[in-house]
C-alpha cells in the first residue's frame, strides 16, 4: 500500500470573477502551503421505483464537494496582506482593507473560489466554493486557520 503524504501540500486557489464559474489556475496562484488537505464528495444517488414494472434508471444528485485544510497564521513581516488572507478570507464572509478583515454575515458581491489540488495522484477541483474559517491557537506553538470550503465538483 502506498504511503499517503498528506502533511504539506500546495493548493491552487483563485477568487472567481463570476460566482460559480471555474477559473483557470496557474502556478502563480498555487503558492500557499497548506496542511492536512482533505477532499470529500457529497454526491447522492436517487433510486427510482417504477409502479408499472418497467425499468427506470436512478439519478445522480448534485455534484457537491468539500475541501478542508489548515494554513499557518503568519504575516508577511512587512506591510501588506499575506496571499492566504487575500485569497481565503473573502469567500468566508470577511471584507478586508489594509490588513484589517471584518466579518460580515451577508454582503452583496459575495466572493467564491476555485480550488485545485492533486491528492494521491488524482486531480481535484471545486468551483463556486464558499466556506467557513476557524482560528486554532496553540499555547507556545504554531497557530492555524482551519478552512472548510464547499462547492461544485
Report each predicted region and the residues it spans:
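Signature of extracytoplasmic/envelope-associated structural regions
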Residues: 1-153
